[in-house]
Amino acid sequence: MPGPDDDVREPTAAARTNNSGYGLRAAPSSITSGLDSVVSVNSYRSSELNAEEVNVDDQECADSDILESPNDGMTIMNDDDADLSEEEEEVMENSIDFSVNRATVTKAGVIPCCVFVGRVRWGTTDWEIYFGQKQLLRLHFNLHLYSLFNRHKLLRGVHLPCTIWREKRAEKRVMDVYVVQDYIRQLLKDRDLRNSEPLLSFLEVSPSRAMLRLGPSLKEGYVHMRINGPFQLPLYTCFNRTIEALYRHLYRAWMRIAFVSAIVGFIFPICLVIVTSLPTFFSPQKELVNSDSGTKEVSTKLNTAGVFLGLAVLGGILFFAVFVYKFFQHRLGVIRRWVVLKPSCFAAYRNRNDREPSEVFLFDKNFTARKGSYRQGVSWMPSGLVVGSKAGDIEIDTGHYYTRLTAFVALMGVCYGIMRLSNSIYDFEYLSLDKSMGVPITNASGYENWTESRDAEYCGYYFIVPKGTTVYVESKDDSAVISQLQMPSSNSMTANLGFFWQSDSMGYSLNVITNAVGAGTMVSVVKPIDAKNDRFFESGTNYSMPTVGNLTLEGVKTDIDVQSFSNVESFCAITVRIAPLTWRSYVYYILFLFAGGIIAPVVGFLANYFVTYLGIWHPHVRRDHWFRCVRRLQKLKRQETSTRFNSFAPQHISTIDDDESATITAKAKAAKLAIGNTPTSNINQVVDSVVKQEAETASRMGTGNLAPASSRVDSSTQSEDSFEAPKPPPSSVSWHVDAEDTYAAMYKAISNAKYEILIAGWWVCPDLFLLRPGRKLPPREADEDPDGQQVNKTMLRQVLMKKAEAGVKIYVLIYREVKLALTLNSAYTKRSLMVHPNIRVLRDPIFQIQSLGFWSHHEKIVCIDQSLAFVGGLDLCFGRYDHHGHPISDPSDDPVWTGKDYSNPIIKDFVRVNKPFEDLIDRASQPRMPWHDVHCSISGPPVQDVAYHLIQRWNFVCSKNDYQLRTGWCICFRSRRFKFLPKCLVPMDFNGWTLQYPSSDPEPMRDGSTRTTIPLVREDSLSMVEPFQVVQSVNPMYPCTATGPQWPPTSSLHPINPMRPPLTSASTTTGPLDDGEVLRAQRGESILQVFHPSANICNIQVCRSVSMWSAGVPTEASIQAAYMDVIANSKHFLYIENQFFVSGMDGNGIVRNRILQALVDRIERAVQRDEKFRVYVVMPLLPAFEGNIRSHELTNLHAVMHWQFATICRGRYSLFEALKGVTNHPENYVAFFGLRKYGIMPNGCAATEQIYIHSKLMIADDRCAILGSANINDRSMNGDRDSEIALVIEDMQYEDGVMNEKPYRRGVAASKLRLQLFREHLGLADDDLSVADPTSDHTWQAIKSTASSNTKIFEAVFDCAPSNRMRAFVNFQSIEVTQIFENQRMNVLKVPGRSHVWDAQNLKDGDYAPWTDVNGVPIAADRVDLRDFEVDNYRDKKKKLFSMDHDGWCYARNFSIFQEVRTMKTDYKKREKLQHLVADRLMAQVRRRRWVKKGLLPPRDPRESSFSLASDDEEHGRFYSLWRRLQQGDFSRSNSVSTPTNFSQLDTDGGISGSVSVGGTNHGRRLYNSNSMPSNASILGDNPTTRPPVLGDAPSYPNSPSVASFQHTPQSPAIATGARSVRSARTSSLLCTGAGVRTRGNTRSARGSFYGMFSVTGNRNLDTDDESSDAGSEYGGGHGIRASLKRWYSTMDVLDFGRRSKFNAEYFDTDEDHLHSDDPLLEDGRGSYHAATREGLLTEEAVEGSDDEDAECQIGHVQTAATVRKEDETRARAQLSEIRGHLVEFPLDFLVEEILKPSVLPADIHI
């Protein structure tokens, strides 16, 4: 029931008593009134309504659903979102009104039945229900049960009239309409019954009735249903489609047969055994014992062991029975649900008062509906219907209980038949004695004293079954009792109660199940003594039987209890039958059970059909009503526009009219006037007169027959033949290039959401900021600190949480990644977002077999209220935010890219996304990878198609997780397969469907009320009566867009009621309506007001790539079809932006998509016709996969490159190879480009990086565009791999343009996007029109020339990869090396002092070479001049894990530890640190250190160097550590055992001695062989002048942004005094550098540091300035150091120990007067770059850096990101200023001489 805030208003006082206010009704249909068997009866209705109250209700309804003004951030709750509680509110008296509208006689069976059509009114909603006499009987029975179990008393207040109990003819039953009406009304007056589940279910009252935004409920009720979708049947995929169809067709029928067979074959025999064995376990045992008096007495005792054994056996049998039942219950998949028929779906609720459905079956365009019959075959249910679509079938069974009843009766009959027929399987032999040879009782021994008394005495005999024989004994004597006796202990015996039966009892029929006994068993046969007819024989008589053997008959007698037996010398003759049991008997019995298992369900089916055919009960009444409603919806679906590209979504055609023409057209249609020949004034006059006449009619007739306007019931109708669908509302699109504009639009749309938000993504980061500071983030709030960092409240999780708290329901559907391959951490996303009940998150797939789970869900969808959708290639995740400037660095003090949002996937992919504020790479030295993407927002009918796709996927995931729908073989007893099962989604109703019902002519009564005649209608044909009709408004009202014509027209069609649709003609007000409901569309009241700025009206077709595994539907590849169609129909040019370009041609059996073939065919056609046709392809220079492109170890990076090059230019199936046979100049038709950007890093170095193109876009002829999430590869295009969605957007608005130097009408939307992209890539102004003609030779050559010029400049300045000059791996050797790693191993057999303990010559096979890059790739000796390098001895967080000395050496067990630590996490716990301490520090075998090109290391504070007091982590105290080092005169731990390698490894030219030359090529991770090392190394002497300056050359700056984390340390006086001179010197140095890079030379640091105080050998460096000398003198000896430390600590500021905020810790401070800018000053119109002059680089104050290590490039020094040396920046400045835009050539010859395809990876993963 609705909550207190629901939009279900309590009717007025007049409306509470009114039963006839259902609107102005037309006369009965001519079809109905023309029937011969019409009987009229009267139904009394109450008084009239007031017209003023109707108008008030009308206004309230109009105001309830239409949002007239912005909500200022507040959320308007929908009627079904107000109360989420599961408890149903009490139904107040008079809130539900009921009346019988009409009675119908239907002859669906042999016996006609009467169907009552009741009218239920609840609040502002009314509907009709269909029921018969059997439903009323069932209602009354359920009410009795409800009162008994809930109220604990019998139902006495309301009695079912006897006339309803009695069976009568249908024509006479119609006279009971008043009785039925009064009976239901009496039930509604009782408070308890009014709120009872049986009555509310009968009246179909549920909260879904009030859910206006989901559309009207055409039919509701409890039914049994099955969903036969994918994953609902085990092994649903077969090798043959015919076999698969047959399997699906008969699966549940065979399961039902198997179920009944299991009952008959297993459960039935076991139950019989239980019934006959219970007395054995639980009955007391009786024995004869000797009493004290010497007589025999019966002793009774309980067998305790038998009781427990019986309980155990009973429990096991019950468990087995329940197991079989539950097993087949899940196999059949039958569930009981409250099912609601909506215009778009079947919504199934677990309970009637639920607000969210547990299962939803969506209708597609071509869904089918058929009644259940023997031909249908799915379930063989005569009282049900089957609705089918591409996603499967749903079976609605309205008579499931009747089916169960007939099945149960048939089962019992078959079981009884098996028991009765089982005697036929035995070969009986009779044991019959000749009575003529016997003697009467008077002469029988042992009976001499027998006298006749009241107590019956039994005589008889017993025998022992011979060995090796099992027999079955029975007697035809009704009085005979056969028992199994226990072995006698004396002269008495006791019967075994487990084998005790009488011939005339049910035990007689149990036969082989209970009466078979084995060898050695004593079987007694006794009967009451008949003194007259019995004859006695002597005990011990032998009787021979051929099949059994000799039987010795011993006489026994017993009393009436037949419990204790005593021996007697004679016995009476009793004839019995004895049959031996053989294997033949058991086989026959099993065959009986098997035949019975098949006969039972078949008989049940036939009995159900027969009873239904006769019409004895009426489940078909409900079935027929359900079926007619579904069939009517089926007709409506088929009236829609056909689809394109084999898509699931219908084609939407937008129409464009201006305001005046739209108004005139609508009015002309309303008055049935010719538009061209009728003046506008005449149209207005006609329409106004119609409205006036309607108002007068309503006032003259009163409002007694008018329903409140809030019920949306209108009398205007259109017949089926004259129906003309109104023009659909227009579709509009708005472009969003790059994430800044996209996220801003999403933020605004999410903030304005009213009802629900749907999000689907490949990756969703809850910590993503949608708006960024300095860009589109709103100004600071008044309560914020103006000097502090601005608080960003646009984090995705915060925005969604705010809307969830406001009542908006949020559904997030994300891809569940394969953890071994991806690090998306979707589990973290789910945990972070699911913090409110209104936020639901699903991850899919849970388990996937296809290709080992490599396929993914790749859509990027955000849908707001199902009325505004964002579709494109942009994920809501890290690394995507960017704008048109595409900066590669973020030097601002208020960063735009925080934490992991500053990323470069090629350098380092995302890890630990649950820690969003950790840096992935070094911000000071490593550039971020700019991200280019294109998204769009759409409004109009296509939004419902996008929402349909997402809802279908959501519901499919729910159905896969729903244990009650699955029929897998492993689910039996688990009541809930998932603890929190999400609810399904129902599409919103944007057609504004409302129900309208006909009524009879009213007749005024004396008391002022009205009387309505209820017709009796005989339905001989179901097609005669339709359940509802469609009446749509002539002019659908839809919200206007920011551009283009206003929609709807500004002038109202009805001055009296603007929201009311126009009338088609005056006659339609009184025209007849068909019997049943009328479904009317009133778009103006149902469609939300959507604010869609900068939108253009166009046609939009939604396409997708889905299959069984992803969406539960047959494979759909409509995106590929759309691409091929647009390419084939293009006339002038194609512009393609895509992340990948992998396609194939005919004959290529590996790559299956044929986009490339369509492209070749189109170019071939252009060549043949001598047409100018251009193809622009813009794609990434390198795929964004982490890897080493110069390594021979091929990875995913090389694999994707291989397939892209194979598509473009390499191989016989490539594009250029195919074009060679078509034209000699393919370069005139197609060109490939990339994007690249340069900038200045915070460390002062110029750098470049590719702009990663992630968009999935194609523009054709400036008139059509395809945009979505689908890449050009098989994963996205084939449909059976990744799930995708895309939009085909065709312009409907055109403007003048130029194409091929000729006038051309170009589309407004497509050309707008294309020009925006061209201007951004080429660096043009926003109003530049030089690229307006993309086909002309001038534009073609200019674009190619710009790209070529930019490429040459980038290669000349940065020497970056990829490049056409790098044709093989050997070409990488010519690229400058910027960092190298020196590797050594310890030789434990050598003694220090005699030889080096650490040496490169100790390296073993499998170790790194002496000199390698970061990945272990050897570096040739002739490529490195060590004098140009310096040791990186700064200890970051990762290096602290190793035992690092002050020469930069890091120690570990083996070289693999270095790679693991470098590529894995950095937030190590204490346990992990202890592990490294024990394993790596104490057992170190190898060591490694890094050498970096001079000028590339970021400036650092001297206190951060390895010589700092604070950096000596290996010692217990700073003072003692420094004192020990000063006493030793050495600052290097390694100098005590070896000569510094940085000197010994140099030859006379400064090169590396002992390094390995690769001989012209490099091998990835080459295993180093110590035998190949030179034996003698050229060592320079101890002359310090010839030694390369390793330390002390670089000045130190305390606030470098690349510095890793360190705490504030107290400043020494020397540092404080030298601060000003440092800043002055640095400023002057920067200003005089042309390229903006600091001048290094021989300038010494003005600060007191160990850089300027000591040389490498520990001696005092004399080449220092005065301040350095003074500072160093304090540390010159043992006496001076103590005073220096004392003064140092005395001057420290205690506040410096405080840790700064997390945001400030990751970035450096800037000048207050500094103006933020996107790009460094190397671009045109800018002076020297600002990053070097920031106060953050020059301030004396130390700041805390990031905790992450300085990221090391995964691909070594050859990468898309490259830097410029300081010596080259002056020259580079002039060259870089000549770059225009971002466009560069795509390197088609990159690594053309190498094989890039990995042999171990499957091909389909990368294509």
From Swiss-Prot:
InterPro entries: PLipase_D/transphosphatidylase, PLipase_D_fam. It comes from Phytophthora infestans (Potato late blight agent). Its EC number is 3.1.4.4. It is an enzyme of class 3 (hydrolase). One of its GO terms (biological process) is glycerophospholipid catabolic process. PROSITE patterns: PLD. SMART domains: PLDc. The gene is PLD. Belongs to the phospholipase D family. TM-PLD subfamily. The active site is at H858, K860, D865, H1254, K1256, D1261. It is found in: Membrane. GO terms for molecular function: phospholipase D activity. Its main location: membrane. GO terms for cellular component: membrane; plasma membrane. It comes from the Eukaryota. This is Phospholipase D.
